[in-house]
């Protein structure tokens, strides 16, 4: 199957980005809406606004791939080696189930594996598990590092076979109803009632995604560093736990008409082809994104280098281990992922995507979700194409060139909640937001956090000078709270080194909206054209 988490892993209820219709994520969602009949047809369960059948998503991805004449899709191989010369990656080796080998030589290689399997093979340094507070600077990180990753899940897709049907599976070995006694409350009609538990992942087509964290089928297994055969054997425990949970749903709860879907996964047990890994290896990149880059966006200039966006809270699944530190995560606004998190610190001609990007363990809880991973992958592919065209290492491709290429694909580089791709000024407002001259206002909001640009609001003089000062330090930060007028904006833009805007006398004393100010900035100062490095510092 094509699609990873969304298809082969069966995680077909997407988390987040409903209000960030960016790039490939939006293209994929448009295909789903056309296939099923609109937005409402996908909003079938309460965990997500976008639910679908894995085989439908797979067909969509194959259709999208077939539209690219230079793209060849090859199935049935797994990564077994990385080709390299010193610190430079030159391609990869793959092996099929019969032992057949395939060598792919490439100018640029991208690791899009779930667990970062190309990292050790390429000699790229990485981290695994929870980071120490002294290492990341995150106040919420534990005092000491450990190698514990989040719980994983083997997803089951159940199908309603109709009244009178009994699709109860054979009682699995080792089944004990007490194992799942806390997954629901039979006396409750609330969130954790039996029906509500199933409605969590209700999909179109009379199906249910079984990916339940509350004493359900999550499991903690130490498999990341195991060789392929040993990892596969160890993951059998996850498959067995899901089968026990399915039997529990059928036998104890009485949902006998719900059986493992016969039209999704061609596996011996009918479960997803691959486990849903929430965390694996995390590369040491040119930069490392931390939770502080989300909670305090403007403390570091990494926001200037955004290449993908997300709006999901920090979500860790660690219920299966009681020996780990308990962390109460703060509410966060939406965020962008910096370009430098995709580029290894030392390895050349190599880009990292998926969950193996250079992020802290804490913020991985937000960057790991399907829409963010898809958009980060789009950025990785864009960076790879530009590096190949330029015949240069990825780290030498200008940040702004990557961002411009993404904007041309209607992809977000800043997580603007209130400016959509069909806005005629979308690209301009994205660019100006990415300079920080006009700052976003973050808002934690339930499970769909926001960052507002407020294009139709005016802006105080002091707020404008604060943003302009970062671009042109010669501009002093003022405390003036009056609304910025066109004449005052023109004067400040000229003082910052821009062209003097031509302002009609009748408009001189009128306050500018943030939209009009952004257009004026782009026309007369063009701050986005000023290069930034991978740390977001102006060159």
Identify the role of each PLM range.
Residues 2-81, 85-87, 127, 150-156:
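Conserved N-terminal/central alpha/beta ligand/cofactor-binding core
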Residues 13-18, 45-51, 105, 228-235, ...:
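Second-shell loop/turn segments in exported
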Residues 24, 28, 57-61, 114-118, ...:
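Stable alpha-helical elements in mature extracytoplasmic
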Residues 34, 67, 81, 342-358, ...:
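Glycine-rich, acidic and aromatic/proline-enriched surface loops and short helix-turn segments
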Residues 76, 95-108, 112-406:
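Flavin (FAD/FMN)-binding glycine-rich loop and adjacent Rossmann-like elements that form
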Residues 396-426:
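Long, well-structured alpha-helical subdomains associated
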Residues 415-528, 539:
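Extracytoplasmic Gram-positive cell-surface binding/anchoring modules and repeats
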């Amino acid at each position: 199957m094509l699609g990873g988490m969304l298809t082969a892993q069966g995680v077909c209820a997407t988390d987040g980005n409903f209000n960030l219709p960016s790039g490939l994520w939006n293209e994929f969602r448009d295909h789903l809406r056309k296939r099923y009949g609109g937005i409402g047809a996908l909003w079938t369960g309460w965990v997500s606004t976008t639910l679908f059948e894995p085989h439908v998503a797979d067909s969509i991805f194959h259709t999208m791939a077939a539209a690219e004449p230079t793209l060849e899709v090859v199935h049935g191989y797994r990564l077994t080696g990385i080709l390299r010369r010193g610190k430079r990656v030159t391609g990869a080796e793959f092996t099929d189930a019969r032992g057949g080998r395939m060598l792919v030589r490439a100018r640029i290689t991208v690791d899009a594996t779930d667990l970062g399997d190309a990292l050790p093979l390429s000699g790229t340094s990485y981290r695994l598990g929870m980071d120490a507070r002294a290492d990341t600077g995150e106040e919420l990180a534990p005092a000491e590092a450990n190698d514990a990753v989040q719980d994983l899940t083997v997803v089951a897709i159940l199908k309603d076979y109709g009244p009178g049907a009994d699709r109860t599976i054979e009682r699995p070995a080792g089944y004990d109803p007490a194992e799942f006694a806390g997954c629901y409350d039979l006396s409750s009609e609330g969130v954790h009632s039996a029906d509500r538990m199933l409605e969590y992942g209700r999909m179109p087509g009379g199906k249910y995604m079984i990916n339940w964290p509350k004493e359900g089928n999550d499991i903690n297994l130490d498999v990341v560093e195991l060789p392929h055969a040993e990892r596969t054997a160890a993951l059998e425990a996850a498959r067995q736990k899901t089968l026990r949970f399915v039997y529990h749903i059928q036998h104890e709860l009485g949902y006998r008409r719900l059986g493992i879907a016969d039209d999704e996964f061609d596996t011996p047990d009918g479960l997803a082809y691959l486990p849903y890994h929430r965390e694996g290896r995390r590369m040491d990149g040119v930069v490392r994104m931390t939770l502080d880059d989300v909670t305090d966006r403007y403390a570091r200039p990494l926001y200037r280098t955004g290449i993908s966006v997300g709006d999901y809270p920090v979500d860790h699944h660690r219920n299966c281990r009681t020996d780990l530190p308990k962390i109460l995560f703060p509410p966060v606004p939406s965020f962008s992922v910096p370009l430098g998190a995709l580029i290894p610190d030392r390895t050349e001609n190599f880009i990292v995507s998926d969950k193996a990007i250079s992020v802290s363990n804490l913020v991985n809880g937000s960057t790991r979700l399907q829409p963010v991973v898809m958009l980060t992958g789009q950025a990785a592919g864009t960076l790879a194409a530009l590096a190949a065209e330029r015949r240069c290492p990825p780290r030498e491709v200008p940040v702004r060139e990557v961002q411009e290429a993404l904007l041309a694909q209607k992809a977000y580089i800043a997580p603007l909640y209130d400016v959509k791709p069909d806005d005629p000024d979308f690209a301009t407002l994205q660019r100006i937001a990415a300079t920080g001259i006009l700052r976003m206002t973050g808002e934690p909001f339930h499970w769909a956090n926001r960052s507002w640009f407020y294009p139709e609001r005016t802006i105080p003089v002091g707020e404008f000078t604060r943003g302009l000062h970062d671009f042109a330090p010669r501009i002093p930060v003022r405390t003036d709270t009056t609304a910025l007028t066109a004449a005052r904006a023109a004067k400040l833009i000229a003082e910052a080194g821009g062209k003097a805007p031509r302002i009609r006398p009748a408009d001189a004393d009128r306050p500018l909206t943030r939209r009009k100010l952004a257009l004026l900035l782009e026309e007369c100062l063009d701050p986005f054209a000023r290069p930034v490095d991978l740390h977001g510092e102006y060159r």
